[in-house]
C-alpha cells in the first residue's frame, strides 16, 4: 500500500514537472514545445551528470582504499569466523597473522637472549663483588682474631711473669724464667719440693709446643737482601743524616709549592674550573646511572608487553575453540580476562617509567653538554687573562731593565769613577806630603806633571756632549766630535745639558722597548 502511494506521488510530481510540455500539440506551438522540452532535458542532464560522476569517483576511491585481504581475525562471531576461516581469504589472513606472530617471536627471542647475556654479565659482576667483600671480611676477621690473641697473650705474660711471643705460624714461643715449686710423685709416693728454671715453648694454657719454630719469613728476607745488593730499603737504611734531612726538606718544599699553587689557582680563578671539572665527572656518572635505569625500564616494558601479548594470544586461542570449551578453559578465560586490565596497567606504568627515564637521560645529557661548553669557555677566558698578565709582566720587566741600565750608565758609573779619582788623588797627595825633603829633586818632575806651569797648554779632560743642530752638516760634525771624544783616552768626563739628557734617555728607552717588543713577538 505504501509502495503504491509512493508511485502515485512520483507520477503526480512528474506530471506537474513536465505538464507544460505535454499539452496537446497544435500547429502553432509544436516547434516551441519541442524546443522547451529539449532545453529542459539538456538542463537536467547538465546538472545531474556531474553529481553522478562525483559519486562514482568517490565510490572508486573508497573501493581502492580497501585492502584486498580484510583482517578477518578481528571478527568475534564464532560461526562467521568459522565460515571465513574455511575460505581462501580467511586462510590467507591466518597465514599473515602467523607470519607476524613469528616475526614478533623472533624479535622477542633476540631481546630475551640479549637480556640474558646482560643478566649473566651482571651476575658475574655481583659474584666478583661478593667474593671481594668476603675476602675483605675474612681479612678483617683474621685481624680481629690476631688482636684478640695478642691481648690474651699479654694477659698470660702478665699473669705468669714470662715473656711469650707469637710466631709467623700463629703459635706462641717464649721463655718462662719464673721459679716455681713443682710437686713430683715418685715410686715411693714421696713428695719432694723442687725448684727449676723451665725454658719452654707453650701456648696461653701452658701446653708445650713441638719445637721452637724460627721466624722463617724474616730469615728468608734477610738472605734475599744479602744476596741482592742495592735494594731501596737498604739504601734508605744506609742514608746519612744529611741526606735524610735533605729529603725531608724537599718534601716540605713540595708541600709549600702545592700550597702556593693552590693559592695562585684561587687568585686566578682556576679553582672554580677544577670544581666544574669534578661536577662534570659527577654528571658523567649520573648519565651512566640514568642510562642503566633506561635499560632496566626497557627490559621491564618489554616484559610487560610480552606478558600482555602472551595473555591476549592465549585469549584468542581460547576464543577460536569457544564451541568446545571445558570448565578449565572457562576458568582460564575468566582469569585471563580479569588479568588483562592489570597487565594493561602494568604496561602503561612501565611505559611511563621508561618515558621518565629517557627524559631524565636527555636532561642529564643536556646539562653535561652545557657544563662542558661552560668549562671550555671559562678555560679560554682564564688562558686569555694569564696571557695578558704575562705580557704586562714582560713589559714591566723590560722597563725595569732599561731603567737600571740608564741609572747604572749615567749615574752610578760616573759617580764611581769620580770617587775613585778623588781617592787616588788624595792618596797621592798624602804620599807626596810625607816624602822627605831629601827626595825633593826626585819628586819635582812628578809635581810639575800634576800641576802644570803657566806657559804650558792645559789638557782638556771634559767634553760637552751635544748632538742637537739645525743643519745636516752640523749634525754630522757633532756626531764625529762626539765619537772622537768617546774614543779619546784623555776625555774622562761627559757633560750634558738637561734637555739633551732627557732627549738621549727617551731615545734609549724607545730603542729598548722596540727591541723588547720585537723579541717577544718573535719568540711568542
Swiss-Prot record:
Locations listed in the record: Mitochondrion inner membrane
Residues spanning the membrane: 392-412, 503-523
Domain of life of the organism encoding this protein: Eukaryota
Residue ranges that the UniProt entry lists as topological domain Mitochondrial intermembrane: 413-502
A GO biological-process term: inner mitochondrial membrane organization
Chief localization: mitochondrion
Coiled coil: 92-133, 270-304, 338-371
Keyword Transmembrane helix found: yes
Membrane topology: Multi-pass membrane protein
Entry GO CC: mitochondrial inner membrane
Pfam families named among the record's database cross-references: She9_MDM33 (PF05546)
Family, per entry: Belongs to the SHE9 family.
Protein's recorded name: Sensitive to high expression protein 9 homolog, mitochondrial
Name of the gene this protein is made from: SHE9
